Structures are given as C-alpha cells and as structure tokens.
Amino acid sequence: MSYVPGIGRAPFRRRGEESPVSARIKIILGAVAYIAAFHWAYATILARSYDYEGFKFRDDAAIISVTWLLALVPSFWMPSRLTRPSQLAYWFFYLVIVVPVAVVTIHSYPGDAHSGILTAVLIVSAFAVLGLIYAVPPAAIPHHRFQPHGLWLAVLLVSTLSYGLIFSVFGIRFNFGSLSDIYAIRAEYKTIVENTSVYISYAVDWQALVLNPLLIILGLISRRKLLVALGAVGQFMIYSFTGYRTVFFSTILLLVLFLLCRSRDRFGIRVLLVLTGAVAGATALYLWFGSLFLGSLIVERLIGLPGLLTGFYFSFFGDHAKMTLSHSILRGIID
C-alpha cells in the first residue's frame, strides 16, 4: 500500500484505493467461502465417489474444526494484491496445497487423525515461515534485461531440440481420443517412454510445462495471436499422445490466470471467488446431473489429490528410506 505523506498532516490514501482493513476482511471472507465450498465438495464427491483412492471423511466435530482453523489461518497474512511475481506462486500454494492438506490430509491420513493433524500443522507452519519473505524489502539488485531477440532465439533453439526428440519417437499426430480413453493413451505413452531414452520424457515435460505455456502467456501479454496459437497447438499435440488432461486444459487455465492478473490490486479476492465458484459449480453439477466431469478435473485432480498424496508421502517415508533423486537422471550419483 503506497501513501503520499503531507507536511504537518497524516498520510492519506489515493482516491479509490482500498483500505488495508477492508482488503483483509474481503480476503478472509473469500477464504471462508472457498474452504466451505471445498468441505462441501469433499464430503459430497471425494469421500463418496473417490473413496477407493483413499479419501476418507472423519465425522468428528473436533477434527472438522481443526481442518477449518488450519485452512483459514493463512488468510490473515495472504497478500491481498500482487506486488511481486513470487506472490502468484504463494497464492497457488495456498489454494491447491495448504487448504487441501489442512482438509484432506487430516481426514484421510493413513492411521490416526493425530498424525494427519501434525502433518498439516507442519505444512501450515512452513508456509507461514515462507511468507515472512514478504516482510523483507527487496534488495537493490542490478537488473540485466534479457534482450528480446536473445529470448526468442533461446526458446526457438530449445523448442527445436525438444520437438526433434518428440517427433523422432511419436511423429506428428493429432489423434484426439475422448477424455474417457486417456488411461489407454497414458499407458501407451508410459510403455513407449520406458523403452526409449529418458531424455524423451524430459523433452515432453519441458515443452508441455515450460516452453508452450511461455509462448501462450507471452502471446497474451503482447497480443500476438500467432504465439498463442503455436503454444496451444503444441499443447494439443502433446496431449494427443500423452493423455495428460493438465496439458489439454493448460491454455484455458493460462487465459483465466491472465485475466485475473490484469487487476493486481484485487487479485486475492478474485482468485478466491473464481476457485470457489469452480468448486461449488462442480459439486452442484454432480448433485443435479450426476456428472463427475468437473468434479474429476477440479475437485479431485487439482485440489484433492495434493492433500491426499501429501498424507501418503509423509506416512510412507516416515518409516522407509528416502528416495532423494534416485529416480532421475542423477541416479548414478545418488545411488
């Protein structure tokens, strides 16, 4: 919040600028709405339709109160407006990691609820410590801007290399199966990757998770439709042989994110309301029409699974040796 000091009088806010108290109240109320919507979706969709994956519901008032408390506490310090790029990631951590951990991990932790609560407390505490960085003014570091032609040359070279590896194995194809066939497509992709070089999977991941999204977001910012089209076509092609729905819907997600970031002063409440509406809409769609299409994409995959897998991870590696990076290309050094 910026203020203009006056001589001999108190500082005042710019006209139309929201007060810190008002902005904080909106963030807290938005968080309450989001947590309530996710609790509703969890009890209605995840604990019923996806119980075979490990989603459980502990019908205990004390446990439910703890989930509410741990999920809501971070809203008291979450940034209401974007002033640093990293705050976008910080909000992402809160919405799809901290809240799911506070709810799902406690309900579904293997064994007793106490271990799940302890895990959630540790995660929320670590998240709070991470947020302390925003209390420190940014250091005056000299910026060496990357020249545009250098950026495009780097993107072109890396994309050419990764697409060359991808085309050598999968060819150029746009065979879109139905969303119900993705598991067969994924199984085929996994088999191919296991029988080829590990660098193929790295090339696919870099193109799908870094380079194509970079083209899309740069195209949106600069209003260059060709860049958006190139990135989107690349994502659809990669989806056609991987079956990863995250890749398929990434273009839409980036567009929504771009629209949310256009108003950085109200980013916090906007992203809370958008995700609350998405979760509530997915739950209503399931109750009214029995469809799990949005429930699977938003409630289970995007929000629910991070909380579930966090509990599984802590439970398993609490009693077993850590893998570190022994599954990666560094296995020769780690093993």
Q: How would you label these PLM feature ranges?
A:
Residues 172-176, 223, 291-296:
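Juxtamembrane/interface segments at transmembrane-helix termini
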Residues 254-271:
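Perimembrane helix-loop-helix junctions
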Residues 222-236, 268-278:
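Short hydrophobic alpha-helices at membrane interfaces in multi-pass membrane enzymes
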Residues 104-119, 233-259:
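Helix-loop-helix junctions and helix-breaking kinks within/between transmembrane helices
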Residues 292-335:
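Membrane-interface loop/short-helix elements at transmembrane-helix boundaries
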Residues 2-211, 215-216, 265-269, 275-283:
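Membrane-anchoring hydrophobic segments
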